[in-house]
Design a protein with these regions (language model features):
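Positively charged n-region of N-terminal signal peptides that target proteins for export
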Residues: 1-6
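Bacterial N-terminal signal peptides
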Residues: 8-18
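Boundary at the C-terminal end of the N-terminal hydrophobic targeting segment
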Residues: 20-27
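Contiguous segments within soluble domain cores/interaction surfaces
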Residues: 29-147, 161, 167-169
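Extracellular Ig-like/FN3 beta-sandwich strand-entry sites
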Residues: 94, 153-155
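Surface-exposed, short loops/turns at beta-strand junctions within beta-sandwich domains
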Residues: 148-152
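A short tyrosine-centered beta-strand micro-motif
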Residues: 156-160
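Short beta-strand edge segments in extracellular beta-sheet folds
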Residues: 172-175
């Protein structure tokens, strides 16, 4: 298990997500522009979760354009990036988020120490709790992991809390 931080690479992927999230926040479907009720969850009055997605991050074979593909299955291939993106509207400039990543068994490694926030592990080694305080900027918060040699196969779960309130739960299979 390895936490990945590819800021420049991720920004290109996230900009695509932002367009869809902004359309949804405006009551429009990102696919066809039709009016739909916005999927909005209120968090602590000042913060609203607009949309959240889980999936795979990848690059073109030539190392060009990054891609985000929604998925509920992560290939058990070392180096495969996966994670979540959540669009948030807030009158706050900084947002606190907490991620609880639960694996079916403890991995060989959780990777390098967290450099942008805090990470704690459960006593049994199956749960990593990552917390960060981030600038909201373009309205997107995210986290990504890379599959590492020795990661367990099976059902994983990520719970994301924004400003102390459960915002999204992502369940997916690694195989």
């Amino acid at each position: 298990m390895k936490n990945t931080t590819r800021i420049v690479w991720m920004l290109a992927v996230l900009s695509t997500f932002a367009v869809a999230a902004n359309a949804q926040a405006a009551g429009k479907s990102a696919e066809d522009g039709a009016s739909t009720p916005p999927a909005v969850m209120e968090i602590a009055q000042a913060t609203r979760v607009i949309r959240g997605e889980f999936g795979l991050f990848s690059e073109d074979a030539d190392g060009g354009e990054p891609h985000f593909v929604r998925s509920k299955t992560v290939p058990l291939v070392p180096g495969q990036s996966y994670g979540w993106v959540i669009a948030v509207r807030s009158n706050q400039q900084r947002i606190h988020w907490r991620e609880e990543l639960t694996l079916p068994a403890s991995p060989v490694t959780w990777g390098a120490p967290e450099t942008q926030g805090r990470r704690a592990l459960s006593d049994d080694g199956r749960v990593a709790i990552t917390e960060r305080e981030v600038d909201l900027g373009d309205g997107l918060i995210y986290n990504a992991w890379d599959v590492a040699a020795g990661d367990p196969q099976g059902r994983y779960r990520i719970r994301v809390f924004v400003e102390g309130t459960l915002a999204k739960v992502f369940e997916f299979d690694v195989r």
